[in-house]
Amino acid sequence: MINSGIAKRYARAFFDIAGEDKLYEKYYEELSGFARIVQGDRNLKEFLANPVFNQAEKKAVVEAIIQKIRMSDMTTNFLKLLVDKKRIGMLAEIADYYRVLMDEVLKRVRVSVKTAFPLPADVTSDIKQGLEQMTGKQTEIVVEEDRSLLGGIVIRVGDTLYDGSIKTQLSNIRNLLGEAV
């Protein structure tokens, strides 16, 4: 997707500048916070993404929001640049890519854990410790319940999927039996 490449470039540029101060998390919180405000208001989101409205109007709205939530000059200038370059509509995607870059530098990895039933805290802690040893990075675990798994666990670490669900095991058995017939 063309916008993906553009969003990555803007995220990389902002991240590189943020690296001078080593305030990666602060700038991420400001960027993602502003993105949440935009995403949370459908009218604002449509207004900023609509090319019919002129850039001066968009910039005035962005500046008014910035005044209310107070953020660093660095993030303020970056948001104004996005308005000037007609890229403010890509802010959520830019913030997502920035997070990926930040996690890489800070040696963190986001992990998605899906189970059919709620996990006890001690099991979640054991999974976290095991993944930290395996990856050599600090892990941030998001646990989701998915009753369709029937049992077992599915763990996604970056692009790698570890699927120990009963649903997948039954599907594999079904495929094997289908091939044998």
UniProtKB/Swiss-Prot annotation:
For this UniProt entry, the molecular function terms from Gene Ontology, in alphabetical order, are: proton-transporting ATP synthase activity, rotational mechanism
Q: Does the keyword Cytoplasm apply?
A: no
**Which key words are in the record?**
ATP synthesis, Cell inner membrane, Cell membrane, CF(1), Hydrogen ion transport, Ion transport, Membrane, Transport
Subcellular locations according to the entry: Cell inner membrane
Topological category with respect to the lipid bilayer: Peripheral membrane protein
Q: What is its main location?
A: membrane
InterPro entries for the chain: ATP_synth_OSCP/delta_N_sf (IPR026015), ATPase_OSCP/dsu (IPR000711)
Q: Which domain of life is it from?
A: Bacteria
SUPFAM superfamilies linked? N-terminal domain of the delta subunit of the F1F0-ATP synthase (SSF47928)
Q: Which GO terms describe its cellular component?
A: plasma membrane; proton-transporting ATP synthase complex
Pfam families given in the database record: OSCP
* UniProt cross-references to Gene3D superfamilies, sorted A to Z: N-terminal domain of the delta subunit of the F1F0-ATP synthase (1.10.520.20)
- What HAMAP family does its record include? ATP_synth_delta_bact
Give the protein's function. Answer: F(1)F(0) ATP synthase produces ATP from ADP in the presence of a proton or sodium gradient. F-type ATPases consist of two structural domains, F(1) containing the extramembraneous catalytic core and F(0) containing the membrane proton channel, linked together by a central stalk and a peripheral stalk. During catalysis, ATP synthesis in the catalytic domain of F(1) is coupled via a rotary mechanism of the central stalk subunits to proton translocation. This protein is part of the stalk that links CF(0) to CF(1). It either transmits conformational changes from CF(0) to CF(1) or is implicated in proton conduction.
**Record's subunit section:** F-type ATPases have 2 components, F(1) - the catalytic core - and F(0) - the membrane proton channel. F(1) has five subunits: alpha(3), beta(3), gamma(1), delta(1), epsilon(1). F(0) has three main subunits: a(1), b(2) and c(10-14). The alpha and beta chains form an alternating ring which encloses part of the gamma chain. F(1) is attached to F(0) by a central stalk formed by the gamma and epsilon chains, while a peripheral stalk is formed by the delta and b chains.
* Family per similarity comment: Belongs to the ATPase delta chain family.
The molecule here is called ATP synthase subunit delta
